[in-house]
C-alpha cells in the first residue's frame, strides 16, 4: 500500500496511473495457495477482477486455475500461463464464436448459466466432434446482505438456473451425448463480510447436492462455492489480507463434502483489490 516514502518515489510520474504493491500481492496469493493446500481445495482466480499480465502470470505460477467470463479473458488467461485444462469459461453472454474458440482450445469446462446455453454448447460440440465438460450455475435464492448491485443469488438476478428447472436440466444432460456433466457452481454476491451468509449458502448447496446425487442419480465431481469474500475498506492498513482462513473454515465446517468430490472456489476481488491503487 502507498505510504509517504513510496509517494515521494513516485513524484514526477504523470498521472493517472495504477500502483501495485507487489509484495502485498504475492503475500496474499501465497497465503491463499497455502490454505488451499491445507484444506485440500481448488482455487480458480476470477480473471475479471484484474487482467494485468504480471499479476496473472504470478497467480498461474502458483497452480491456480482461471475463471473467465468472456472469450478474450479465456485467450488472455491462456496466454498468461494458465493451462487450458485449468480454465473454466463462465458468464451469461457467450457468443458462438467464443464457445467455438474455447472448444478448440480444450478448456477444462463451460460453466453454464441457462438451459438454452447447454443446448447450444451440446450442438456445437457435436458439430465439431468434441465432448465438452459442463458445470451448471445454480441460483440458490439467498440474500447475500450486500449492496443490491453486487448480489447475484436471488431469484430476480439474471445468473444461474433455478431449482424449478432441475427436471429439465437433468433431462437435457442425460440426452446430450457431447456433454459431460462436471459439477455445480454457486455464487451469491460480492463484498460479503457476514460469514453467516456463507453458512446459509452451504446449507442450501448441501440440500441441492444431496438431491442431485441421490434421488436424481447425477454424478458430480466438484462443487464450486464461488467467491464473494469482502475486503476491509474501512481499515485497509490494519487488515490488508482478507480473512481467507475463516472463510475456508466456514465451508469446511458447514458443508459435508462427499469423499469422491472436490470443493472449489473462485476468488477475485479478495485476492487483488487491496494490492492496487489508482493515483491521480
Pin down the residues of each PLM region.
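A charged N-terminal "starter" segment
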Residues: 1-132, 171, 175-180, 207, ...
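Glycine-rich tight-turn/loop motif centered on a GG-T
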Residues: 10-18, 104-109, 148-160, 194-198, ...
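Short beta-strand segments
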Residues: 46, 133-139, 185-187, 224-226
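Conserved radical SAM core fold
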Residues: 52, 73-75, 96-98, 140-155, ...
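Short acidic, glycine/serine/threonine-rich loops at helix termini
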Residues: 56, 79, 99-104, 121-124, ...
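Histidine/acidic-residue-rich, glycine-tolerant segments that coordinate divalent metal ions
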Residues: 149, 153-180
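Gly/Ser/Thr-enriched, mixed-charge loops and adjacent short helices
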Residues: 174-194, 198
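C-terminal active-site-proximal or functional interface alpha/beta core segments in diverse enzymes
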Residues: 190-280
Amino acid at each position: 500500500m502507498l505510504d509517504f516514502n513510496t509517494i515521494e518515489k513516485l513524484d514526477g510520474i504523470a498521472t493517472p496511473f495504477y500502483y501495485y504493491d507487489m509484495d502485498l500481492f504475492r503475500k496474499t496469493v501465497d497465503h491463499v495457495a497455502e490454505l488451499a493446500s491445507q484444506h485440500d481445495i481448488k482455487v480458480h482466480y476470477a480473471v475479471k477482477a484484474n487482467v494485468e499480465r504480471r499479476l496473472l502470470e504470478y497467480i498461474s505460477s502458483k497452480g491456480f486455475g482461471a475463471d473467465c467470463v468472456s472469450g478474450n479473458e479465456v485467450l488472455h488467461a491462456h496466454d498468461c500461463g494458465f493451462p487450458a485444462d485449468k480454465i473454466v469459461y463462465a458468464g451469461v453472454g457467450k457468443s458462438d464464436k467464443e464457445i467455438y474458440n474455447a472448444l478448440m482450445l480444450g478448456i477444462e469446462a463451460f460453466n453454464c448459466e441457462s438451459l438454452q446455453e447447454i443446448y447450444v454448447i451440446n450442438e456445437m460440440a457435436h458439430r465439431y466432434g468434441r465432448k465438452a465438460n459442463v458445470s451448471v450455475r445454480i441460483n440458490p435464492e439467498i440474500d447475500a446482505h450486500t449492496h443490491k448491485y453486487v448480489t447475484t443469488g436471488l431469484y430476480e438476478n439474471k445468473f444461474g438456473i433455478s431449482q424449478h428447472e432441475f427436471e429439465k436440466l437433468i433431462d437435457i444432460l442425460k440426452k446430450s451425448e457431447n456433454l459431460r456433466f462436471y459439477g455445480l457452481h454457486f455464487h451469491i454476491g460480492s463484498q460479503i463480510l457476514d460469514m453467516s451468509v456463507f453458512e446459509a449458502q452451504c446449507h442450501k448447496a448441501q440440500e441441492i447436492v444431496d438431491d442431485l446425487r441421490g434421488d436424481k442419480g447425477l454424478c458430480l465431481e466438484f462443487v464450486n462455492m464461488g467467491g464473494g469474500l469482502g475486503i476491509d475498506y474501512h481499515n485497509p492498513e490494519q487488515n490488508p489480507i482478507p480473512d481467507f482462513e475463516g472463510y475456508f473454515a466456514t465451508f469446511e465446517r458447514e458443508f459435508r463434502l462427499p469423499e469422491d468430490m472436490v470443493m472449489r472456489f473462485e476468488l477475485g476481488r479478495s485476492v487483488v483489490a487491496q494490492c492496487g491503487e489508482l493515483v491521480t
